[in-house]
């Protein structure tokens, strides 16, 4: 999910939380104290694309760096909860604007996931506000930290971070990364079309460029109508896009946040969901349960249709992620 959409849902842009690795273990630490990881050789080497085609539906999660006002240890609380659902990998977002400073926190959290939780991590790498030199430096750091997978994104434009000119589009970033290191490279896709694309045909044509540049796996923007995703898959396959495509799912937990997100990110609300919001929107507990049930229903239908994978936008809420994961655990393995 883009930082714009995340901001619409949490009301703040994720900020940098770690400076470098200089503490031995997790626990309560004063703000600003730094973290050190044991970056010994891992027992596995895993590219995200290798997870697919093995007889089960891939199930992954997204997290974001905690807000500046949150305690440093809050990321551990999220990850402690997510490890129990055994995701196939966890992606880590960036902050609005995609500045190199915010991408640095993405790198550090991805390293925590890889080296402390032993779960494959996929770091978001953006280029809208970065030079080739800055991207190269970030990639070198990721490789040094044992992070082998990246999600290559243009990133959201932000007036606080004037755009650089080294990369015009995400396909250029994909090609650049593939030439510079043995990374698994994934890309984003939009079942209802990128907000800046003039039409769906052009959008799929641009997505094909991204895959031809070297993207080995795609993660979709969130959507609420599975038929939109199925039509998108058909367009992709007809265009010759054969890489695995994960369906991005976000549970509806807050009426105001979802309405802001829809206005900013372009996802549409089907009639079934608008009825749900109208009925339960003023009752937070009821909406939470109804929203989780809606997400479970979406995921069950997608798995039954044989989708490659499910990417759950957790919004750093491991309890909701676990409730959803537990509900679909058996059908994922069939």
Regions found by a protein language model. Give the residues of each.
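N-terminal amphipathic alpha-helix/helix-capping segment at the start of soluble metabolic enzymes
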Residues: 38-61, 68, 274, 333-334
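Active-site beta-loop-alpha junctions enriched in small/polar residues
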Residues: 63-66, 93-97, 124-130, 155-157, ...
């Amino acid at each position: 999910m883009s930082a714009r959409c995340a901001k619409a849902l949490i009301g703040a842009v994720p900020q940098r939380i770690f400076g470098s690795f200089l503490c031995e273990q997790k626990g309560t630490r004063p703000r600003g104290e730094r973290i050190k990881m044991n970056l010994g050789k891992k027992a596995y080497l895993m590219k995200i694309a290798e997870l697919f085609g093995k007889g089960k539906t891939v199930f992954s999660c997204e997290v974001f760096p905690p807000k500046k006002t949150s305690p440093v240890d809050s990321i551990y609380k999220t990850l402690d909860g997510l490890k129990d659902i055994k995701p196939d990998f966890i992606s880590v977002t960036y902050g609005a604007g995609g500045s190199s400073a915010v991408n640095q926190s993405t790198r550090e959290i991805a390293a925590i996931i890889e080296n402390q939780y032993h779960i494959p991590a996929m770091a978001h790498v953006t280029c809208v506000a970065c030079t080739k030199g800055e991207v190269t430096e970030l990639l070198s750091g990721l490789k040094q930290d044992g992070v082998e997978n990246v999600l290559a994104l243009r990133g959201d434009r932000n007036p606080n971070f004037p755009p650089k000119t080294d990369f015009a589009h995400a396909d250029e970033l994909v090609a650049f990364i593939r030439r510079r290191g043995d990374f698994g490279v994934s890309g984003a896709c939009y079942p209802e079309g990128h907000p800046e694309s003039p039409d769906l045909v052009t959008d799929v044509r641009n997505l094909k460029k991204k895959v031809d540049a070297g993207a080995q796996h795609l993660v979709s923007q969130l959507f609420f109508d599975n038929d939109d995703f199925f039509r998108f898959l058909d367009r992709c396959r007809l265009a010759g896009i054969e890489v695995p495509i994960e369906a991005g799912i976000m549970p509806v937990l807050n009426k105001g946040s979802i309405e802001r997100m829809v206005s900013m990110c372009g996802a549409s609300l089907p009639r079934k969901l608008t009825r749900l919001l109208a009925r339960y929107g003023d009752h937070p507990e009821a909406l939470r349960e109804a929203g989780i049930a809606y997400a479970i229903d979406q995921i069950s239908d997608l798995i039954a249709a044989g989708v490659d994978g499910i990417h759950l936008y957790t919004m750093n809420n491991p309890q909701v992620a676990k409730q959803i994961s537990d509900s679909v655990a058996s059908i994922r393995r069939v």
